[in-house]
Design a protein with these regions (language model features):
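Noncatalytic linker/hinge segments flanking ATPase motor cores
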Residues: 80-87, 122-126
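Helical (often loop-to-helix) elements that flank the catalytic cores of nucleotide-handling enzymes
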Residues: 101-116
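Charge-rich, low-complexity segments
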Residues: 1-82, 89, 98-104, 131
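Conserved short beta-strand edge segments in small beta-sheet-based binding/regulatory domains
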Residues: 112-131
Length: 131
């Protein structure tokens, strides 16, 4: 089952700083499939500019590595990227996956060619996609 590649984009604010929110549209069939029951957040801190947004160079790096990871996770049907929050010196990628262990395995495999990255990953069971 393929995820839509249609997204909405919104500007918001968090802790007085600008926040860019991207959310994936038309995921009902994937949500209702019961396959992706674990909510997984990957948080990637960056230096940012004076407003807490990534610099152009940081944006290129975040986009490149995020796309590599998203493609691998979705090709292997291990996780679906559902939302991205960028601001306050961190990029937060929200996924729904089959398991935290499988997600971690693919992250390690995908990023093995790079120096250690300052990412943090958290996961929780959320079969109804309520978070």
């Amino acid at each position: 089952m393929q995820a839509s590649n249609e997204w909405f984009v919104a500007d918001a604010e968090s802790e007085g700083m600008p926040l860019i929110v991207r959310g994936r549209l038309f995921l009902d069939a994937l949500r209702q499939s019961g396959r992706y029951t674990t909510r997984i957040a990957l948080v990637w801190p960056y230096g940012g500019d004076g407003k807490g947004l990534p610099t152009d160079k940081e944006t290129r790096g975040l986009d490149l590595l995020n796309e590599q990871l998203r493609q691998k996770l979705e090709d292997e049907e291990a996780a679906i990227l559902t939302a991205i929050f960028i601001g306050n010196r961190a990029a937060r990628y929200e996924y729904y996956g089959t398991s935290a262990e499988e997600f971690g395995r693919i992250v390690e495999e995908t990023f093995a060619q790079y120096p250690p990255l300052p990412i943090r990953i958290g996961a929780e069971s959320d079969p109804e996609w309520k978070s």
